[in-house]
Amino acid sequence: MSSRRETRASAQTFIENLKPLQHPNSEKVFLSGSRPDLRVGMRQIHQTDTLHAKTNGETLREQNPPIMVYDCAGAYSDPNADINVHAGLEKFRQSWIEERQDTELLKGVSSQFTQQRLADDGLDHLRFDALVKPRRAKAGRCVTQMHYARRGIITPEMEYIAIRENMAREHVPEGVLTQKSAGESFGACIGEPITAEFVRSEVARGRAIIPLNINHPEAEPMIIGRNFLVKVNANIGNSAVTSSIEEEVEKLVWSTRWGADTVMDLSTGRYIHETREWIIRNSPVPIGTVPIYQALEKVNGVAEDLNWEVFRDTLIEQAEQGVDYFTIHAGVLLRYVPMTAKRLTGIVSRGGSIMAKWCLSHHKESFLYEHFREICELCAAYDVSLSLGDGMRPGCIADANDEAQFAELETLGELVKIAWEYDVQTIIEGPGHVPMHLIKVNMEKQLEHCDEAPFYTLGPQTTDIAPGYDHFTSGIGAAQMAWYGCAMLCYVTPKEHLGLPNKEDVKQGLIAYKIAAHAADIAKGHPGAQVRDNALSKARFEFRWEDQYNLGLDPDTARAYHDESLPQESAKVAHFCSMCGPKFCSMKITQEVREYAADQEAKALLAQAPLAQANIQDVELISPDEYKARQATEADLAKAMAQKSAEFKSQGSALYHSIDSSGINDNKNDQQDASVVRVPSLEIEG
């Protein structure tokens, strides 16, 4: 069997045997809202207790609270969920949509293309098993979350988001876990608890969007805006030469496990319609598309043959399937195309290049631009959000911030205001490839021209020298852009510019971008962002290895790296790792210094006359943790450090020592040259 068939067979096995995928020592919990059917799923990471040895031989047990984190996986992380990809996820938002009484079920699909696909018996083996009738706004009604928000209505979706964004931080005990720096938010409203009213006001103002098509009731409400947690999008989708429906469903599930807040289906191969149906029905997160890709397939890949009628039918087709947001390159105008002539890499956006070719071949303005108001009317009937594509984005750092890029940005600013006339939620897409020193001006210009509509960027990549590592080169720029105010980051995988990403590439891209987004949340001063960092740092200092792994973004990889060099069970509780060994772990030394100073303080107290005559039961020996708050004297610390200095010199002044197979240092028999660092299977001349 070929590797191509093996991959597809593996994906088929995965989705047919799909069970909830839980992270180690994590629990799915639900936070309740104001109504019984408003239950917000979160992931709670349980921690072990910290054990403090007291000088009298007793052990103090300190309880470490569970840490609540944002969970994108929906039913895929719920052990009580009944998962069947052939039936799709539970339509838990259906009742919220119906109770508003502003939508109606259609007798059948409206798109001519969908009608043709349904009439083709040859597609039965690919078709989703549980197709439902589509829903649309009643005549004269608008059903967008922005429409409700502007009328002062707080929807269940808005309340759900407020609970989700707060991550139950009000229950975190004050102390070491809640300490944080003030942060620099660059004008964003960061710091106060998120309320449902705040969510409503931000959506009404256009500073945030809630991408939720009325035909995607399986999706859990989430929000994109610079005054909320930074979100991450993952791209999946088949191509004309690779991938299958099974593989794309597998990537969808995998994406939500590793933190994708939204997923874009960028399929360009055969069976785009069928693939998308499977993805939407099984997605707990909003799904985005680039409709021009499918429209191009309908005209056999000839850009010049595209027209408004084909594109409009594609929008209706996808809206009735449940696509939550469309990327539309309506800002690519005929007069902007010549501006790219002197670029090093020209027009690199697929959608942008398609529309540029159409404009030149017809010598007319883009039909996307000319029919933009009709696009808005259609989106308002299904609550499809718009993501205004940056077709003129730079494809290399040499082309960053040029005339074409910023001319299009100004046009996108004009279009977002038109969309708001129709109460259509809108975000703006951004670059691309931008060196670090040119990133901030992108955010500043976007805020200026687009009236604070949410910004959504692909990175940007900060250097072009690392094919195969562009999740690193772009993660740097993504963290910066998000700090300055970007609301959502589109991930880049190691395969960027090289090929279609597989399952492992999706994970690597998401981990890189979750790091970037989280780093930006901390830098902005988001009140709950640093709790997880503090919990992990405390676990690291206390050598609670399992808690270190489990609090991280990727517990499996962290555990595997540790166990490569110290696989023994004893190493799981050891107060050192293979980096420094038991003698020179800086955190272990610090603990010993604190314990020594605390012991000296206790002895000094006992030596005092009043205490010497007192009943010993009246004397409480404080723990290192308690002593830390009182702080040792400079003399105590100096004495302890001098003792450690003597120990270091007596052991040969070597920074590192070899570790035998049991993981225990044996310095007495170590005759190694001090200029060679030795750890298992590693030898570095130093």
Curated annotation (Swiss-Prot):
Keyword check for Acyltransferase: no
Residues bound to [4Fe-4S] cluster: 577, 580, 585
Region listing for Disordered, in residue ranges: 659-686
GO biological process: thiamine biosynthetic process; thiamine diphosphate biosynthetic process
Pathway recorded for this protein: Cofactor biosynthesis; thiamine diphosphate biosynthesis
Enzyme class name: lyase
Cofactor(s) in the UniProt record: [4Fe-4S] cluster
Entry binding sites for Zn(2+): 433, 497
Binding site for substrate: 235, 264, 293, 329, 349-351, 390-393, 429, 456
Catalytic reactions of this protein: 5-amino-1-(5-phospho-beta-D-ribosyl)imidazole + S-adenosyl-L-methionine = 4-amino-2-methyl-5-(phosphooxymethyl)pyrimidine + CO + 5'-deoxyadenosine + formate + L-methionine + 3 H(+)
EC identifiers of the protein: 4.1.99.17
Keywords, comma-separated and alphabetical: 4Fe-4S, Iron, Iron-sulfur, Lyase, Metal-binding, S-adenosyl-L-methionine, Thiamine biosynthesis, Zinc
Complex and partners: Homodimer.
UniProt cross-references to PANTHER family, sorted A to Z: PHOSPHOMETHYLPYRIMIDINE SYNTHASE, CHLOROPLASTIC, THIAMINE BIOSYNTHESIS PROTEIN THIC
HAMAP family: ThiC
Biological role: Catalyzes the synthesis of the hydroxymethylpyrimidine phosphate (HMP-P) moiety of thiamine from aminoimidazole ribotide (AIR) in a radical S-adenosyl-L-methionine (SAM)-dependent reaction.
Protein name: Phosphomethylpyrimidine synthase
